[in-house]
Every structure is written in structure tokens, then in C-alpha cells.
Amino acid sequence: LAYDYNNRHQSYTVGGTAKYLLAKRASYIEGNISTTNFRSFYDYINDAKTHKTGDEVLSKDQTYTNANLKGVFKTHKNNTLFTGLDYVFEGLEPTETSKMLNNEYQSVYTLAAYVQDEVKLLDAISVVAGIRYAYNEKFKSQFTPKLSLMYQYSELNVRASYAAGFRSPTLQQMYAVSESRGQITVGDPGLDPEKSNFYNLNIEYNHRLFSIAASIYQNDLKDKIEAEDIGTTPEDIENGITRRRQYRNIEKARVKGFDIGFSVRPFTGFMFGANYIYTDGRNRTEDIRLERTVRHSGNFNASWRKTWNDYTFNIAINGRYQGTRWSKTYGNAPAHQLWDINTRHSFNLKSVALEPAVGVENIFNYTRSEEHTSE
């Protein structure tokens, strides 16, 4: 399937960080702020109904600002207290291809405060407890607690944890009417925020020559946000639109699964490892799989490092396998693998340190069909 334009993305980020070390060892206060502007463009390579070859059309214009202030206080050798404040601002401009439902600029902010305490109760038992309060401009107040318990015995670690979650709909999901490659996605101002309860059990064994780890988890979600196909209108068909979707809430959903992995260090400088991940995501309201979920996936990595006098050579190979991705809207996306190789070269000169890096991403040049790359 050929298209009349290419997608192009550009972004810039500006920000700064300040850190103040306190007299008590390992205690400090840190603040940072950053602003990111993200833009997408359609660069036309063929003449179309409304544009000529060479036209540049702004398709997305979004701004994020994030500021936070956190304090880490070592109150005792067995106790560390974390506190903080967060501010997040999101702004979304209407564009030619991503109009707003009311055709107006939209923005939203979220303020949050949190406290978390890490306590070592006994030589083998540690507890982490925390709570976060968030105030969202549109969805008001929300408290989310977390709790974890870890048992350590020699080289064995066992951790059980629980965390509540809260995620507001994005401005794109609430207000935008976006058109891309014959598809329209419509926001819904009436969306509710997602809420979740996450449970996890993790076991790790760390030896000098190898490590193994396994975990099982379950995430119960309420009002999960997902886009569904709502069918095209006669006007859509007349304008060449083949699919129309709208964001909605799923009343009940659940994601559960497990992963198991290992890493081996047979000799100095060399390491390799792999892991397998199984994920089962279900829309419990309709008793079907969650959109765009992948049941089977895995990762492989290997690296080698060697130093000769003032030169150090690093090489790393990383591979990722993704099984069939299920989609009611698009049909299943086929399983695939992606492989990267990277090298880093460190030169430790008398007064200058140089570290050039060379690598290749997607070594085997895997590409997906356009219908499986859309959100």
C-alpha cells in the first residue's frame, strides 16, 4: 500500500537540574525542570487531493513540562525517607490533520506529592511503604499507596509487592480528531481515568558467575482506555477514509503473566543472558483479549569488554523477539525479531577522554506493514 507522504518527527528539550548535599551522609535535595516540544509533519512526495509534492503539513504539536523536587534523607543506618513534589503540564495544539473536538487549544496540569519509607527491620527483612497524592486539573484528587516486603538470605532475594495506580487520559485521547493514512481516530471528553491494582512476586539468585530471576504478576484495571472501531460514515467513504475509531473505557480488564531470565559471566569481561516473558491481557467486560497484546516475547544480550593500555573496546549484541500481536481492529501482526549491535571505543589520553561509538540498529532490516504501525 503506497502513501502520498512520509512521516517526520522532531522534538527539542530544555531543562536543568540542581542538587544540594546535606551534612548527613547520603542525604540530599534535588530539583529539576524540563520542557519538551514534540512535532510531527507530513512531507508530501506525491500530488494528492489537497496537497502538492513538497508540501509540509504539521500533523501534531504537543508540549510537556515536568518539574519535580525530591528529598532523600538517611535518618538511620536502617532507614531512608524519600519525599517529593511533582508538577506536569501538557498542552496540545489543533493542527490541519489533528483537529480538536472544539477546535481549541487544550491543556491540563497535575500536581503530586509523595512520601516513601525504606526500613530494614531485621538483617534479612526490608519493607518499603509509600503513598502518593495527585491532583489533576480535570479529575481532581487521587491517593495511590504502595507496599513491598523483601527477604534476603545469602545470595537469594524474595520480594512481594503491591501498588495502586492512577492514569489520566491524555489530551489526545480526550479531544483530538486525528487523520492518518486513511484512518480517523476520535477522542472522547467523557473518558474516565484508569485505575489499577498491581501485585508482584519476584525471586532472584545472584552468584558471582551467574544470576537467575523469575517473577509472576497480576494487574487488575478499571476503566482501561482503548480505541475501538466504530465503523465509517458515508462522508468517510466519500473522502477515502477506510477506518474510524474512538477511545473508550473498558470497565474491567486484567493483565497477568510471568517472566524468567538468566545472565552468565563465565570469564572477566564477557556476559550473556536471555529472558522469556508471557503476558495474558484480557478485556473482562467482553471476555476477549486486550487490543494489541503480545503473549510471547523475549530478549537476548551479550557483551564483551577488553582493555589494552589506554584503549578499551566494548561490543554488545541485543536481540528482541515479539510474538504475534493480537488486534481486533487490524488483524494479527506477525511475530518478528529485531537485532542491534553496538561498539564503544574508549581512549584514555593524558588530559582528554574520547569515547566514540559505532553501531547498527535493526541489522536484518525488518519492516512492518503500515497497518500494524498505527496506534
Task: Put a short name on every predicted segment.
Residues Y5-F139, P145, M150-Q152, F210-A214, ...:
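Face-selective signature of the C-terminal outer-membrane beta-barrel domain
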Residues R8-V14, D61-T65, S107-L111, S141-F143, ...:
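Residues that define the transmembrane beta-barrel architecture of outer-membrane proteins
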Residues V14-Y20, A67-F73, A113-V119, L147-Y151, ...:
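Residues on the lipid-exposed face of transmembrane beta-strands in outer-membrane beta-barrel proteins
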Residues A23-R25, K74-N78, L122-S126, Q152-L156, ...:
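Outer-membrane beta-barrel channels and translocator barrels
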Residues R39, G91, N102, E137-Q142, ...:
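Surface-exposed extracellular loop regions of Gram-negative outer-membrane beta-barrel proteins
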Residues K120-V127, Q218-D220, I241-R325:
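Gram-negative outer-membrane beta-barrel transporters
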Residues A163, M271-F272, I277, L290-E370, ...:
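Conserved C-terminal beta-signal and adjacent last beta-strands/turns
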